[in-house]
Amino acid sequence: MVLGNDSTGDEFESTLKKHARELVDCLERGHFQQAVQLIQELSQARDRGLYQEVGKLTRELHNAIVDFQIDPHSPHAQEMSQIADATDRLSYVVEMTEKAANRTMDLVEQSAPLVNQLGDDSRELHQEWQRFMRREIDADGFRELAKRIEQFLVRSGENAGQLSSQLNDILLAQDYQDLTGQVIKRVTKLVTEVESNLVKLVWMAGQVDRYAGIEHDHVSMRHQAALERSAKGEGPQVAAEKREDVVSGQDDVDDLLSSLGF
């Protein structure tokens, strides 16, 4: 992802290099008033860069909220949110997977007795047939055996038809994979877009720190975050409609940013 050119940073660095040489020259020549003026210009240039980067970061954050259609003041915020939509889609995948798994297990449970019966009847008939081959049964026994064989063949045909139908149903129960696969791909795409936007915001926040001259102690920050993990936030503004320093919606944020040139 291309984060965009750092035109503001290049401009500030160019100004810094130019004024640094002039500042050294003024100090060497004893032109202290001019040197102070150059220092003030550098400070103003840094403040302008900081202001622009903070404005761009604020605009990007605001656009990210708008893009995902998350308005905490909207009564339909949950339905409008793409994140909520992704959650619903994943819930749909879970529901479809569970439904297919239950359907498959039910069909297997229905098929198991048919297979077991087929195996038991085959073993019994095989034993009787071995007795017949050893001439251990008489004519009446053979007629009874022939009748059992006929019944077995009829029952086997019926069971085979049921098994074939149930196997087809098991196969059809797996068609959820096509639908859920498409859903998962869409959610994955959304997660990738969110990650890309977050990386961009982190990069822009780094630019703000750069202009402000802020250096973070990451070890201390992680330790502090661990200590405050269970802390609660400030929560919503009380009587925000009566306060002039609190914006009340997305339109107010847009107007504010536009008035500042962002």
Swiss-Prot record:
Q: Using the UniProt record, give the first listed, main subcellular location.
A: cytoplasm
**Site feature Enhances dephosphorylation of CheY-P: at which residues?**
Q182
GO cellular component terms, alphabetically, are: bacterial-type flagellum; cytoplasm
Q: Could you tell me which residues belong to the region Disordered? A: 229-252
EC number(s) in its UniProt entry?
3.1.3.-
Q: List the disulfide bonds.
A: none
Tell me, which GO biological process terms does this entry list?
Answer: archaeal or bacterial-type flagellum-dependent cell motility; chemotaxis; regulation of chemotaxis
Keywords of this entry: Chemotaxis, Cytoplasm, Flagellar rotation, Hydrolase, Protein phosphatase
Q: Which domain of life is it from?
A: Bacteria
The listed locations are: Cytoplasm
First and last residue of the signal peptide: none
Any one GO MF term held by the record is: phosphoprotein phosphatase activity
Query: Quaternary arrangement and interactors, per the entry?
Result: Homodimer.
**What family does the database annotate?**
Belongs to the CheZ family.
Instruction: Please explain the role this protein plays, according to its UniProt record.
Output: Plays an important role in bacterial chemotaxis signal transduction pathway by accelerating the dephosphorylation of phosphorylated CheY (CheY-P).
This chain's protein is named Protein phosphatase CheZ
Provenance organism = Pseudomonas aeruginosa (strain UCBPP-PA14)
**Designated gene of the protein:** cheZ
